[in-house]
Amino acid sequence: SHGFGATYSERTGIIPPKDIDVIMIAPKGSGTSLRRLFLEGRGLNSSYAILQDATGKAWDRVIALGIGVGSGYLFETTFKKEVYSDLTGERGTLMGAIQGIFAAQYQVLRENGHTPSEAFNETVEELTQSLMPLVAENGMDWMYANCSTTAQRGALDWWKPFRDATLPVFKKLYAEVAAGNEAQRSIDSNSKTDYREKLDAELKEMRESEMWQAGATVRNLRPERNK
């Protein structure tokens, strides 16, 4: 995944033969999104990297592969940089950090008397259904310039305290990735015979949390689900 096996070869034992090209296309999104957009005649931007060019045609092949999966923009990286940024992103803003932020804000709202529905809508639903599509299309600066004046002032005042509070966590995370500790943790966890059972228990805990139970209710109330 994103060059994991080859980058951490001393841990995975994956060493490609010297007589083959070793290339990578890394679409910036989930496999389900990549497939859906491909069927719509669109695609995701991707990074590409060449670890070995045994044939002299590795560059041609990797670019063709990127175009073939529908990437509109390709940017060059290395296997090492790709897997470092990927592991950091997954544990950070893409999944780990955002779940932590969701949970913290939801908890504060509930502790101060807000209903589960209100807390979920203000924490998750408005962000994912309204704001992030606008940020994706126009950028965060546009979002700040075009929101209400109360939201604008508050966002400008509070984003730096949030940055300062989370920066040490992100620095620790990147250091763990660079040291190979996150890779080893993933390898060790996935190698255990009871990994699937423990994973199911962790996911069940999240799924049955009040926040995501409220989320299931809110999603079912979306207008498109009641046609």
Q: What is the predicted role of each segment?
A:
Residues G3-T88:
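Rossmann-fold dinucleotide-binding core
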